Amino acid sequence: KLEIPQLNVAEYHRPYVAAWLETADQKVVGNLTVLYDVKKKDKAGEKWLKDMRQWWRKSGRDLAMPVDGVSGATRAPGEHTLTFPGAKALLDKLPAGEYQVVVEAAREAGGRELVRVPFQWPLKSAQSVPAKGKEELGNVVVQLKP
């Protein structure tokens, strides 16, 4: 679950959001989602992807956008439930250890924020791991199932 807060600003733009899976030492395992203006003419929405700096440096610059099953449209303020059907195959290949889901948001004429949600793999039971952003992101809850 991902909460995008409504900000009281003169010029509001929906944030671009990227979520990915990484090891405890911050090596990218795979991308979960990239939400941006996918329908802008001449792929103009891709211009701002680099504003999600951590994601861009670690993974984004090497991707040919849009990525099937990963790319999607920006979301309005509110709470959203995102599912990652490809994550199961990704997780099944991982050795036991500490991992984290990383969520980064950036807005045109706005700020940027990154939230890390740590978890142990493999799971012994279903888990719901909460985290909270301060400005660009609200509550982030990662629900994991074995």
Name what the model sees in each region.
Residues 1-12, 35-39:
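Short amphipathic, basic-aromatic surface patches that mediate peripheral association
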Residues 4-6, 23, 88-90, 105-109:
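Beta-strand elements of well-folded, non-transmembrane domains
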Residues 11, 30, 43, 112-114:
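Generic domain-boundary/flexible-linker signal
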Residues 11-17, 96-98:
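Short coil-to-beta strand junction motifs in C2/discoidin
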Residues 18-22:
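Beta-strand signatures of extracellular beta-sandwich domains
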Residues 24-94:
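Structured domain cores in non-transmembrane regions
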Residues 82, 92-146:
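Glycine-rich, aromatic-bearing surface loops/beta-hairpins
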